């Protein structure tokens, strides 16, 4: 797990709980019907705006946010330059043996098409389509989390209004008004917490993960195209390092 995510989640929730404890009895902030309404309705309302198949992927999306490792662009560039050196020294057909131990299917498919003599424009089109589909899947997952972040506060407000109506319908006991109002406001609190301490931060993190993977695969596409065109390995490296920030770019060139 990314330590930054772990620190962010644990730290945020600890601060929330600590603030609740400062307010007195923690029990006054717990109301099961309010929890069920906010959490349950925030999920069920997704069926209005998203296919059921997409909603089933929520656990997988969360797993990706928490456990997916950020790809190393530096290592990727080093690998692509290595393939360029092999292709220049032994011919592009020799890469067929070099990719047998590679786990990344995107790299394998791209280089295999180059080895097979596929038209360069077709290679780029196929790989770009694959990348576009990846972006679409990531956007779908991000959209689900953003929808939860949008609807949870609304569900909380609905719960608060229900509670207020119930409270105001019976004012025979003035002493119970304060307690009733407190319970009514809990759903608004829960909705705000779900949105701002869970769903929206996860959506932002998924967007960052997506951007990292898009950059990674874009470098692969450019690398495969450079290898296929027979570029000098040094030129391949210079082309690919343009995708890095200037500081990393210079550091990588010095290491090389």
For the regions a protein language model found, what residue spans apply to each?
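Large intracellular
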Residues: 4, 15-141, 213-256
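Helix-termination/interfacial motifs at the ends of transmembrane alpha-helices
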Residues: 7-10, 14-26, 130-209
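Membrane-entry signal-anchor segments at the cytosolic-membrane interface
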Residues: 1-7
């Amino acid at each position: 797990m990314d330590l930054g995510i772990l620190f962010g989640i644990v730290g945020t929730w600890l601060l929330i709980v600590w603030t609740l404890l400062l307010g007195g009895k923690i029990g006054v902030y717990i109301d099961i019907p309010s929890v069920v309404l906010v959490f349950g309705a925030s999920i069920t309302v997704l069926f209005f705006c998203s296919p059921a198949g997409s909603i089933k992927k929520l656990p997988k999306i969360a797993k990706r946010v928490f456990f997916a490792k950020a790809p190393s662009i530096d290592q990727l560039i080093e690998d692509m330059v290595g393939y360029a050196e092999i292709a220049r020294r032994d011919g592009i057909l020799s890469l067929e043996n070099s990719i047998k131990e590679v786990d990344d299917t995107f790299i394998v498919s791209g280089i295999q098409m180059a080895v097979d003599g596929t038209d360069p424009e077709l290679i780029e089109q196929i790989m770009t389509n694959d990348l576009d589909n990846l972006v679409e899947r990531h956007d779908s997952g991000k959209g689900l989390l953003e929808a939860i972040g949008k609807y949870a506060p609304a569900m909380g407000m609905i719960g608060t209004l229900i509670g207020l109506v119930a409270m105001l319908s019976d004012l025979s006991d003035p002493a119970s008004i304060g307690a009733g109002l407190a319970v009514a406001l809990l759903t608004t609190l829960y909705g705000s917490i779900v949105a701002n301490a869970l769903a929206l931060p996860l959506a932002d993190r998924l967007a960052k993960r997506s951007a990292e993977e898009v950059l990674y695969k874009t470098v692969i596409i450019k690398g495969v195209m450079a290898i296929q065109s027979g570029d000098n390995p040094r030129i391949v490296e210079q082309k690919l390092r343009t995708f890095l920030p200037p500081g990393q770019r210079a550091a990588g060139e010095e290491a090389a």
